[in-house]
Amino acid sequence: MKIRNIDLGRYPIFLAPMEDVTDPAFRLMCKKFGADMVYTEFVSADALIRSVGKTMQKLNINDEERPVAIQIYGRDTETMVEAAKIVEEAHPDILDINFGCPVKRVAGKGAGAGMLQNIPLMLEITRAVVDTVKIPVTVKTRLGWDNEHKIIVDLAEQLQDCGIEALTIHGRTRAQMYTGEADWSLIGKVKKNPRMHIPIIGNGDITTPQRAKECFDLYGVDAIMIGRASFGRPWIFKEIKHYIETGKELPALSFEWRLNVLRQEVLDSVNLLDERRGILHVRRHLAASPLFKGIPNFKETRIAMLRAETVKELFSILDYIRGNYGMNC
């Protein structure tokens, strides 16, 4: 699969853009375990043109994580165009437009998935951004606003006509948020549409290597995107790659090995930011990791993780888990 001149190989697997998750440390970790392309946290166009410090930091990328896409969202054409210019100066490989975020503070204001209620404006913004920058522009969106308005098949053609070079589809409507099951049949319908010639990337409910391969085989997508399943589990890319290449599950990764991966993520986050900001960011990853699923009475330990303020505190909690439960996980 290629996006313009970016060769992403066969069966590429992408790390989805996730707010407060896909910081540089996590992106590099996922890249290490096999992610073929990574995305930044989504970036507000309004905040970008106002040069808000925290937002500007989201544009920080490094060569080790390439190819990397920076994703922006907004609801005004002029603002999105100016934001696109700023993003291009950060030298990402791709600029991605978010037309899929379902949360109220974004979609409720007409941005993200809110654009699914204003297709003319969505297309206007897309054309304007494509015409503004020289790097490839891609889009991430959903099936439609609700079950009665699943418009993705026609919308995909319209977005392609605007000049985008790849389309990512999350297999839910905005109304579903993250409930119910992703409808991959509609993603497959877009891919099999003879009028579509850009790469189609599927996203939604890919939590196992078996499901990843099934999505390639059954629906013919050019790539898959992993979101929430990578949260606290960056090695999922390694597991999927191994299964696709061999048809066999990766030999079980030891609890100790996986715990050390999380330790390294803590150190990487602190080194890239500072201890206060790094811990604030990474402690949520640890608390949500499926590595700790099944540990009895884990609620209090999770709360302690979420309250930790130093590397020493977090490592002390991980040492406690290892000493008390490591042999049983």
Residue ranges, per PLM feature:
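Alpha/beta catalytic cores of nucleotide-metabolism and tRNA/nucleoside-modifying enzymes
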Residues: M1-G9, I13, E19, P24-A25, ...
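Glycine-rich, positively charged N-terminal anion/phosphate-binding segment
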Residues: M1-R4, G9, M18-D93
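Alpha/beta enzyme core
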Residues: K32, V81-A111, P120-I198, E214
